[in-house]
């Protein structure tokens, strides 16, 4: 099983990836995280590779709901310069906390943004691709700490919560 570890300034979040239920989504995340997938730099328009998520922030945090990251602009409207289709699997539903899923702006608009739930969110079923889960207690504690951080306008944390790097094993 593939795992991805988000190394944040508040601690590490280890995620078990659902590569069998959401293979394209996992491949996209892993490719962006490890620098093997090409993306478009939103500030220059140039095509590039590199560790996409390194240095990005959790730009949206809603206590009791989710933490969201993966926007290269840090505001929620950025993407890697492409979109891809949803992957819904009958075995996966938003019936528990700590699920990793793609943020989107409608059907088949996945890119780089993702979120981790902090409670059951069944209203998201068949709207967002679930592609991983935070299983260990220490990692869940980091998610909870991020989810309860102070926020300001637009649900943005008042102090940046940074994804320093992502490792995949």
Model-derived segments and their meaning:
Residues 1-169:
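Cyclophilin-like peptidyl-prolyl cis-trans isomerases
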């Amino acid at each position: 099983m593939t795992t991805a570890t988000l190394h944040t300034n508040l601690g590490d979040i280890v995620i078990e990836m659902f590569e069998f239920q959401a293979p394209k989504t996992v491949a996209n995340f892993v490719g962006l995280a490890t620098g093997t997938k090409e993306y478009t730099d939103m500030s220059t328009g140039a095509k590039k590779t590199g560790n996409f998520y390194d240095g990005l922030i959790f730009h949206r945090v809603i206590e009791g709901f989710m933490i969201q990251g993966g926007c290269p602009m840090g505001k929620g409207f950025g993407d890697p310069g492409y979109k891809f289709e949803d992957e819904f699997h009958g075995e996966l539903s938003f019936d528990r906390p700590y699920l990793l899923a793609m943020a989107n702006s409608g059907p088949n608009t996945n890119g780089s943004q993702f979120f981790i739930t902090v409670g059951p969110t069944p209203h998201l079923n068949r709207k967002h691709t679930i592609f991983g889960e935070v299983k260990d207690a220490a990692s869940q504690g980091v998610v909870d700490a991020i989810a309860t951080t102070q926020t300001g306008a637009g649900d943005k944390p008042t102090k940046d919560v940074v994804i320093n790097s992502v490792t995949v094993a």
